[in-house]
Amino acid sequence: MALATNSAAVSGGAAAAASSAPQPRLAATFLPMRRRTVSAVHAADPAKSNGPVQAAAKASSPSTVAAPEKKPVGLGKWTVDSWKAKKALQLPEYPSQEELDSVLKTIETFPPVVFAGEARHLEERLADAAMGRAFVLQGGDCAESFKEFNANNIRDTFRILLQMGAVLMFGGQMPVVKVVGRMAGQFAKPRSDSFEERDGVKLPSYRGDNINGDTFDEKSRVPDPQRMIRAYAQSVATLNLLRAFATGGYAAMQRVTQWNLDFMDHSEQGDRRYRELAHRVDEALGFMTAAGLTVDHPIMTTTDFWTSHECLLLPYEQSLTREDSTSGLFYDCSAHMLWVGERTRQLDGAHVEFLRGVANPLGIKVSDKMNPRDLVKLIEILNPSNKPGRITIITRMGAENMRVKLPHLIRAVRNSGQIVTWITDPMHGNTIKAPCGLKTRPFDSILAEVRAFFDVHDQEGSHPGGIHLEMTGQNVTECIGGSRTVTFDDLSDRYHTHCDPRLNASQSLELAFIIAERLRRRRMRSGVNSNLPLPPLAF
């Protein structure tokens, strides 16, 4: 059996350089603050560093105090395959090393899925969220599948993200960074056990469609490297469709606003505040039209978006890593943003070693098990230059643990002078087993963790920077609760997930309205923008 860690190295010189795409238009910020120029250099490859650089950013709390670049002790020179010298968890064993090497060499010749310039622009937007000037919306499937790949599913999820983004932007009166995570690349999944047993039959666990199949038979569960090529093709096709939706008029603000009005008119959600907000957005657009402000301007008909996924299958990620011709830095061109999961974030592990050398914005999944000192060390390894926007901390720990554990993490990061973006994943800490045996997540528990996240940041004087959701635009019955109540008895009606339960379209939008109200109250308390009549036009 050949370990995936033994795959052939990708030569940085042989890989095609990913040219930086033209920078997308920056959404205008309306916050009454003068944005200070951020001066920081992130040395993705330590060899390219010109020495310590001071990162300067506008400080709204002690957590934004920059620190000089420090090279953590024990780190050697980074290369695209230096991760192979480290212990790699959660990687499959392929039966044929020769076939694996052949597939990886083929992927090396493929064009990049995304461009370096787009990733840099996302980093700038995430830096805004770190400073409280934007809010991140990250959402999508638990795990993409080959079987359910079709244009309608992609469209429906993107549509809900657009609706949520409009609601959050109006409520928070700030730009919303739509990181369309878990799309165009979110296939691989970490597993608690390497094997699964049913009725006395023991087989390798299902690890995602880019590794093996979910059918419980011996042939399907054998890791197949050819699946990586199919995953690449599906990622490119998905991103191509998303780009068309984002720039072809589908994302127009008037259209999105009408969707939200229709949702309120045809839903059982009778909360007057939600209806009020939806109608206020519509009235704002009507005022603009009456004042002669065109709603056909590109700023009103298009939207920026980015993709992200968990960096898990390292041979695949390495094969799509390219040296950017404009900066000389290496980018993992499989997605704009990557995150390291709870099971693979070891300080001396292969996944951290790989990620410290790519210049993409990075996420770190953090549970209640995270030691504050270890978090500070991990951030030092991944962001030695302390560059704003480089690191996003994604907390996932349940409401009660959030109130106890998160303050210590925030204080440790603040005291170290590290600049990060804090967002909450209220899904993974709230998974339970229903009486019927299916996994589910109660909407009330998800909401409780979101509220705890905001409460803690209010208490600590830090910025709640965003939310990370497993969700779909389909009318599934996988999470119980919500105003259109899904009960335990309803779960089997439309339970389609290949992995973990997702919020359906109604539950996702309901959560967005609740968060928007919380953002509005936070804004009114702080006095920021309380005298401004309209939100920014871009979303």
Swiss-Prot record:
Tree of life domain: Eukaryota
Comp. bias (Low complexity): 7-21
Coiled coil: none
Protein name per the record: Phospho-2-dehydro-3-deoxyheptonate aldolase 2, chloroplastic
Protein localization: Plastid, Chloroplast
Keywords: Amino-acid biosynthesis, Aromatic amino acid biosynthesis, Chloroplast, Plastid, Transferase, Transit peptide
Enzyme Commission designation: 2.5.1.54
Presequence extent in this chain: 1-54
Annotated region (Disordered), positions in chain: 1-23, 41-70
Taxonomic lineage of the native organism: Eukaryota, Viridiplantae, Streptophyta, Embryophyta, Tracheophyta
Species: Oryza sativa subsp. japonica
Pfam families, alphabetized: DAHP_synth_2
GO BP: any one term: aromatic amino acid family biosynthetic process
CC per GO annotation: chloroplast
